[in-house]
């Protein structure tokens, strides 16, 4: 019998969807019916994982744990219970065991913030990327379309043999204004590449993390 919980809140759903665009993944344990979400980051992002756990706590039964991976990499992770709503998302986001982008993707500011905290990077003052190299070009173009629908213009940028999404300079003010309320304290360094500006951001940031509730 599947160990499922009740319906997802809109906030929980947004965090899960943002995670699926980034580093999160869904899986169905053999012999079970419903999917679960696994959140797995480096130990250096412990505060961020703890925040995700706090926001998804009603879906979980175990606290985040440290885990040593290949090459001595230290990860920090947790998983949710199995959930029928996660199974619906699994069917949208996975084909033949590979993560894909559904044509119906619609973004909001929380999803965008989670996506950026998971897989975003900023180099210099106007080079902001979503590192979507895991997805096909066709799937990345779906993301570009979804971003445009919320007023964020972007394009594909070649990264060696792969491609990733680059936020256009003209859209950076809106992009950062949209995600800023939801970026947790420990991840605010991604909001500014300049070390002095980064320090100021950290000093001015709220002591409490955004609860989204």
Question: Over which residues does each language-model region extend?
Answer:
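Internal intein/HINT superfamily modules and their associated LAGLIDADG
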Residues: 1-213
């Amino acid at each position: 019998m599947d160990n499922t919980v009740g319906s997802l809140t809109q906030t929980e759903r947004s965090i899960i969807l943002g995670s699926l665009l980034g580093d999160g993944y869904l899986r169905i344990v053999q012999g079970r019916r419903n999917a679960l979400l696994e959140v797995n980051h480096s130990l250096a992002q412990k505060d961020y994982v703890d925040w995700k756990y706090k926001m998804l706590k009603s879906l979980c039964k175990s606290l985040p744990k440290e885990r040593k991976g290949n090459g001595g990499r230290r990860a920090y992770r947790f998983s949710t219970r199995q959930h029928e709503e996660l199974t619906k998302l699994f069917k949208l986001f996975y084909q033949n065991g590979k993560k894909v982008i559904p044509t119906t993707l619609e973004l909001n500011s929380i999803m965008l913030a989670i996506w950026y905290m998971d897989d975003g990077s900023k180099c210099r003052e106007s080079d902001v990327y979503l590192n979507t190299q895991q997805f096909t070009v066709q799937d990345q173009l779906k993301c570009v379309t979804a971003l445009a629908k919320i007023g964020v213009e972007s394009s594909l940028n070649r990264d060696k043999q792969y491609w990733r999404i680059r936020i256009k300079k003209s859209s950076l003010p809106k992009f950062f204004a949209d995600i800023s309320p939801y970026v947790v304290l420990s991840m605010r360094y991604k909001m500014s590449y300049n070390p002095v500006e980064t320090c100021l951001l950290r000093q001015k940031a709220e002591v409490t993390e955004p609860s989204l509730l």
